[in-house]
Amino acid sequence: MTLRRIDPAPPVVTGGRAERRRAARRAAHARRDSPGVIVSRVTGELFITLGVVMLLFVAYQLWWTNVIAQRQAGGAANNLRHSWEQGGGPDRDAGEFSPGQGFAIVYIPKLDVKAPIAQGIGKQKVLDRGMVGHYADGALATAMPWDKQGNFALAGHRNTHGEPFRYVNRLQPGDKIVVETKNTFYTYEMTSRLDQTPPANVRVIDPVPAGSGFTRPGRYITLTTCTPEFTSTYRLIVWGKMVDERPRSKGKPDALVN
């Protein structure tokens, strides 16, 4: 039997990288969120995302639809005037225009409004494209400006999609509304306004419109739009009477020059 030297075991070193990793995992496990905290965090993130989506939608409705519609309406007005310059001929009856077809331009100088007028009041083909629509279908059909008597009734958006009738509530008696057609400028003078009426009250666009103060046939204009703003609960109505008829060959009427 021989003797041999037994070296002592090397000392255990603590605090190394592996130990630190294990300690970190233990700490993370100890801090693990409860199910309630996780649900609250996820719900909060969903609400934030929903809020961003809603803000984008509002921006689209209030701003971008106006940009697109005003661009479309401007192009339609330019194309309409160009077509007038290319050919003559008399004005046509309402039934000879197809739905969505432009045939006139309306100006409201006090409000700095210039918008093409198209046949019909359809949202997609007319109103949402920034145009003003002429009541021309079925029981709601109304006169044309060149008719010797009748009520030329128009509809337009008050908010979004070009909003050509946004500020018609600011019109006062005596303010001018001008309609330009292929051959003629028709100038109307605002006479009265109905601030609120149900959408079902179609008598406001009668040949002698109810509530306007007119009592006998004449050459009238009616503007209709939604009210209050950003809703379609009621209708706001503006009436006027024709005070001047001027051939385009003689130049613009005073209302568009002064």
Enumerate the predicted regions with their spans.
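Terminal targeting segments of Actinobacterial cell-envelope proteins
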Residues: 1-40
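Solvent-exposed, non-transmembrane regions of membrane-associated and secreted proteins
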Residues: 35-36, 41-172, 176, 180-258
